[in-house]
Swiss-Prot record:
Pfam family membership, one: Ribosomal_S18
Function statement: Binds as a heterodimer with protein bS6 to the central domain of the 16S rRNA, where it helps stabilize the platform of the 30S subunit.
Gene3D superfamilies the record matches: Ribosomal protein S18
UniProt protein name: Small ribosomal subunit protein bS18
Subunit (UniProt): Part of the 30S ribosomal subunit. Forms a tight heterodimer with protein bS6.
Gene (name only): rpsR
Keyword annotations from UniProtKB, A to Z: Ribonucleoprotein, Ribosomal protein, RNA-binding, rRNA-binding
Alphabetical list of InterPro entries matching this protein: Ribosomal_bS18, Ribosomal_bS18_CS, Ribosomal_bS18_sf
Organism the protein comes from: Desulfosudis oleivorans (strain DSM 6200 / JCM 39069 / Hxd3) (Desulfococcus oleovorans)
Keyword NAD included in the entry's annotation: no
Coiled coil start-end: none
GO biological process: translation
């Protein structure tokens, strides 16, 4: 009853894709902190591209815009502490 000869189930991972390459109408802008928050952890760290699935070009743009938004206090440098 095993699905494969070794007894392990096969796990298929969905390929990550860059949502900005797929939909060119999505802007990456520091003035829109709601869209940038999806690329920041709850502790305030920028999510790496291997986790977020963005391409290198758009990851650099996201990082640049997050840093700009932090400079003018639209996004926090540090997340909320665990209490």
């Amino acid at each position: 009853m095993n699905p494969s000869p070794r007894g392990k189930k096969r796990v298929f991972h969905r390929r990550k894709y860059c949502r900005f390459c797929a939909d060119s109408s999505l802007p990456i802008d520091y003035k829109n902190p709601k869209s940038l928050k999806s690329f920041i952890t709850e502790r305030g760290k920028i999510i790496p591209r291997r986790i977020s699935g963005t391409c290198a070009k758009h990851q650099r743009a996201i990082t640049r815009e997050i840093k700009r938004a932090r400079t003018i206090a639209l996004l926090p440098y540090v997340g909320k502490p665990d209490n």
